[in-house]
Amino acid sequence: MRPLIVIGNWKMNGSLANNQDWVKTVARGMESGMPSGRKYAVCPPFPYLQQCADLIKGHSLAFLSLGAQDASAYGSGVYTGEVAAAMLKEFGCTCVIVGHSERRQMHQEVDEVIASKALQVLDNSMTPVICVGETADERNSGRAQEIVCSQVAKQVGVLQDRLVDCLIAYEPVWAIGTGKVASAQVAQDMHRAIRLQLAEFNEDVASHVGILYGGSVKPDNAVELFAMPDIDGGLVGGASLSPQDFLAICKA
């Protein structure tokens, strides 16, 4: 059975003071116990990784893991501004987001680069969270599943059997940061299409890979989303900045 996974993506938010309050509040909320068979992680900006690692350890937060928002496609070398997966591993990261739509749009990242990043993450014994999704224009033209399944197929072509150690996050671009959200059934339909695309390669891999939903997940829609058979949790953006909302989603 696939575990339900909730990952908070702070994007370019946070501060030393706010991070302390966030972890303290989440620790207090998790003390009363969490639903069994679930996993949780938070991905702060790079400069806060050490602080958050120390805070998580200091509060004995066994339920919460540390993740990162990106990693370089290269192992080391003359790549100014890049952060290697091996460096993230040293901070205690267990998962790394790759291919987020904001990276695809703002930094022109293509599927081949994203697959290279995923390989770097895997080679350093962490879990890549590979993001896929369609724009509003692509959905309105009836090409949503075609676009997303093409993105998945390109990852399959590079990662092959190693996909079993990855997570996929479906993030409809039109729903990110807009307050819009795909209905639970629309999200389920896409998650099912992704799993069928994976099954064309390997049915066992398809049955084991967790597929998260990442489009404006909030406390008031998390229960319905997480009840869907092919939705295995959420990649949570804006709502993860509120420790109360993050806790509510984790317990949904």
From Swiss-Prot:
Gene3D superfamilies hit by this protein: Aldolase class I (3.20.20.70)
Enzyme's top EC category: isomerase
Keywords: Cytoplasm, Gluconeogenesis, Glycolysis, Isomerase
Pathway(s) of this molecule: Carbohydrate biosynthesis; gluconeogenesis; Carbohydrate degradation; glycolysis; D-glyceraldehyde 3-phosphate from glycerone phosphate: step 1/1
Active site annotation, chain numbering: H100 (electrophile), E171 (proton acceptor)
GO molecular function: triose-phosphate isomerase activity
Localization terms from the record: Cytoplasm
Reactions catalysed: D-glyceraldehyde 3-phosphate = dihydroxyacetone phosphate
Pfam families xref list: TIM
InterPro entries noted in UniProt: Aldolase_TIM, TIM_sf, TrioseP_Isoase_bac/euk, Triosephosphate_isomerase, Triosephosphate_isomerase_AS
Biological process (GO), any one: glyceraldehyde-3-phosphate biosynthetic process
Gene Ontology cellular-component annotations: cytosol
EC number: 5.3.1.1
Transmembrane segments: none
Binding-site residues for substrate, renumbered to this chain: N9, W10, K11, G177, S216, G237, G238
Domain of life: Bacteria
Oligomer status and interactors: Homodimer.
Protein function: Involved in the gluconeogenesis. Catalyzes stereospecifically the conversion of dihydroxyacetone phosphate (DHAP) to D-glyceraldehyde-3-phosphate (G3P).
The family this protein is said to belong to: Belongs to the triosephosphate isomerase family.
Name of the molecule in the record: Triosephosphate isomerase
Gene source species: Polynucleobacter necessarius subsp. necessarius (strain STIR1)
